[in-house]
Amino acid sequence: MKLDEFEKYVADCAQYGLNVVNLDGSGEATMAKNLPEYIKVVKKYGAKAFIFSNGFKMEGQYMRDCVDAGLDFYRFSFIGSDEQDYSKWMYNAVGGHYAQIRRNIEEMVAYVKESGSDCVVSTYHLITDNNNIDEELEKYKTLVDELGVKTEIWKMHNWSGAWDIGDNARKGKIKTCGRPFSPDVVIRAGGLDKKTGAVHPCCQVLGRDEEAVLGHCSEDNIADIFFGEEYETLREQHRTGDYPDFCKSCDFLIEDPEVLVYTNHERDLMKMHGTKFDLNDYRD
């Protein structure tokens, strides 16, 4: 997404109150070479700038520029509790190496402390085998303690419903996730039919993006989309339980209170990072 287009959308949302802008959606924010400029836009409108990332490129001057721009929260996705498991789940020839990611985290933690930044450096981990939770959890906790970061450790998820995760599948009562009713909007860079700024109900549609477009910010303002026909149709589907295809297999609909296995900071299962609302308030 171009910087001027991004600022247009941020300014539009800011009219209605803006607490947090997550700069990644379901993509990789560090693909943008001028990412610090996007962070500055978020700060200009009084919101917090959050990024969830694989962390491959978050090093050196690029990392320092992001922190200095006012980044509030950066989360490294770190799947695999040791080098062997990390290589299985996260390996990438460009930067997905266990030792490299550890160095990137350590470097960022050190710079945040050195610069006096309030940026929170965090990691995100998944239990890859529900039959081996205790052992994996202890290995993750040791890693987190060594790195000196905040963390959250979750059971395996299948939010888009696009994969068969076997024995790791969640189990529980199915009801609306609450997201279509919540004050959270997801704006993508691209769109349909050469439009841009596609609006999705959440970032978990993963791979089913074309099915889940509720409007385009290049064509309408965010209020018209949020209160528009497509959004209201989705809300009614969530009220009745007649979920659309891009929702009905998503395991975010499943009530599983044990899905958040461990956290060492204020991370509530039903509250998205930095937001004030509770999704439970929108699930009844």
Describe the role of every protein-language-model region:
Residues 27, 80, 157, 206-208, ...:
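Flexible, active-site-proximal loop/turn residues at the rims of small-molecule/cofactor binding pockets
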Residues 198-199, 204-284:
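Flexible mid-to-C-terminal extensions adjoining Fe-S/redox cofactors in radical SAM and related proteins
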Residues 190-192, 196-198:
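Glycine-centered positions within short beta-strands or beta-hairpins
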Residues 25, 180-182, 212, 221:
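A conserved catalytic-core signature of glycosyltransferases
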Residues 144, 148-164, 276-277, 281-284:
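Short, compositionally biased leader-like segments
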Residues 167-184, 188-189:
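Structured beta-strand/loop patches that form or line metal/cofactor-binding pockets in enzymes
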Residues 1-146, 150-154:
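Radical SAM/AdoMet-radical enzyme domain recognition
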Residues 84, 127-132, 152-168, 205-209:
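Flexible glycine/acidic-rich beta-alpha junction loops that bind and position SAM and/or redox cofactors
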